Every structure is written in C-alpha cells, then in structure tokens.
UniProtKB/Swiss-Prot annotation:
NCBIfam families: PRK02318.1-2, PRK02318.1-3, PRK02318.2-1, PRK02318.2-5. It comes from Bacillus pumilus (strain SAFR-032). It holds the Pfam family Mannitol_dh_C. Keywords: NAD, Oxidoreductase. It catalyses: D-mannitol 1-phosphate + NAD(+) = beta-D-fructose 6-phosphate + NADH + H(+). The gene is mtlD. GO terms for molecular function: mannitol-1-phosphate 5-dehydrogenase activity. This is Mannitol-1-phosphate 5-dehydrogenase. GO terms for cellular component: cytosol.
Amino acid sequence: MKALHFGAGNIGRGFIGSLLKTSGFELVFTDVNEAVINELNARGEYTVELAAPGQKQEIVGPVTAINSAQDPAALTEAVASADLITTAVGPAVLKIIASSIAEGLKQKNPDHIINIVACENMIGGSSHLKEAVFSHLTEEEQKALSQTVGFPNAAVDRIVPIQHHEDILKVSVEPFFEWVIDETGFIGDVPQIDGATFVQDLTPYIERKLFTVNTGHALAAYVGYQQGVQTIKEAVDTPEIRQVVEGALHETGSYLIDTYGFKKEEHDAYIQKIIKRFENVFISDEVTRVARSPLRKLGADDRLIGPAKKMKQPVYLIKGIAAALAYDFAEDEEAVRLQKLRKEKGIEGVLEEVCGLTPTDDLYQAILKETTR
C-alpha cells in the first residue's frame, strides 16, 4: 500500500512516518523544506533515535520525497495514487495543503479508495481537513468523492524534544507514543498500522490525552515558572510543584473515570506513566516553551478551563490556573498581552474575555478567590 505524508518535520519523520514504514507502506513525504526533501531523496532513509537511556537508533527507509512548492504535478499524482494520506503540519497549515489534496482527489481513479488522517494536536483534525478540502470541490465532486474518500479523526501523542543534529534528517523521539484512530471514519478496509489503536469512539481518548498530558504539561510549566525552575523535569522533581500537577491530574482523572468508564487503577497507572515522561531527562523542555501561548491555553475549552468547568470543586487545577494567569514571560507575545489585559481589566476581565467565564459561574469565583489570596 502507498502512503503519502504531508510534513517531513521531526514529528512526521520520527513518529508517523516511522510507524507507516514499519507497517510496510511505500512511503512518500511531501514538504516545502528544500534541504530536507533533497536529502531524503539523495539518501532514501533517515535515522530515528529514542530519547531514553541507551539512545537506541533505527534506520527508516526506503522513502522518497516531493517538494510540494516546486513540483505540484508530482504531488497531484502522489495524492491520486495513495491508499493512505497522513499529515503532521500543524493545525493552521491544514487549510493550506487542502487545495493540493483536492486537486489530487479530482485526478484519482473514480473507484480508488483513499483514507486521509490528520495527525495534529487538535480535536477533529481530519474533519477540519475534510471541510477545507471540500471547499475546493464542486457539489457533484463532493458527492462522488464521499463514496471513496474517508477522513477518520485521530488523537496523537508523542513528545519530540527541541533538538539540533549535524545530520538534518536525524530525529530524536521519546519511547512512548499513542496514535488512536476512529475506525468508523474509514472507507473500505481499515489499514494495518503497527502501534496504532483503532476505536469506535475517539472522544474518551482525546479528552484523556488533553486533560492528562496537555493539562499536566501546562501545569508543570506555569507552576514551575512561578517557582523559578527552568525545565519540566525540574518542575516535577520539585515536591510542591509535583503535588499540584499530580493533584490536578487526579481531579481530571475522576471526571474521566466517571464520564467514560476508565478503570481507576488503569487510569492511575496512566497518570504515573505521564509523570514519568515529564521526568525523562532526554526530552525535558524549558518551562517557557511549554507555557507559551497562555491566551490559547486558558481558552474556555482548552486544557485548563475546559476540565475545570466539568468539576464541582477542583482545588489543584485552580492553583495551576492561577499560575497561568500570572504568567509574564517577556519574550512570549501572548504572555505580554495577557498581563496587559490583566492590568487594564483585572482578573475579572481576563476570566470573562479569555476564559469565557461569567461572575455567576462557581469556577469564576473560585479562581478569583485563589488569585486574590
């Protein structure tokens, strides 16, 4: 089977591309990074290193690559002939690649089945991509392609640390990964992908990841910054910070267990697995990188306010939210805007305009109380 992957960056090569190649796919990357594309075509393979003791390496290949900016005709042909298309380009870029995908779909054999999976850090990535692709098609084309093109949603999780290598193709990734795909979104047979998990309902896994990995990472960053530590590992190694992180994850865990039926002992083990990932010295990020974009992360449905709204009386989560509201790293544009808004309109203004809360909300009052202690 043929797989076309949009995005030859570290996540594309080190996570999605690696699994697809291990699963036996004929793999083609497409990207606009000329140096990476040229090197992939020259060598036909690349190295993936596990960011863990021993730093085990594997060679991924053979692979080929297409420069989407310089060779749109080759990209159209690659889309049309692919059995599986995946992306790791960032949510904002999906609408940019949509026109290229649409052009390829129009050129494919009418009976040829293609499934397209957006592997982005967002909810409903494939659905968003479908909407963007279909905006380039006529109603007649949309109707016809809906019979042969699937857009199954997915949840992905793997930390790829900031890294610099002499070899521009080498990529380091953490050993842990999770790629969960909604099997009900496929047209035709569900492909065999080693390491991927196929489920009937993706929502529990999306929320479990968002409210555990993303929430925990953010809390370690914001509380860590507040306490003056430099890295996520330092944060979770500091008892008072770890107490807030673990406490909040058990709060979100209670919601996840009650709502989706996860077994308590299994979810508790999942929390500890996530904490251990944060402790990994090989992938420890600076708190200021993980904390960046606080306005987005304090959004009504994001990793902090989102789970807090679903609970009656969160304690540790509110401590973390208070730390996020105080985040003032001068080199972070959103942090500067956040503190400007806080100075002009107070915490009340931030809670209403950024967090989507109102004074009648219990959470609004609880956060207000925590920030004015």
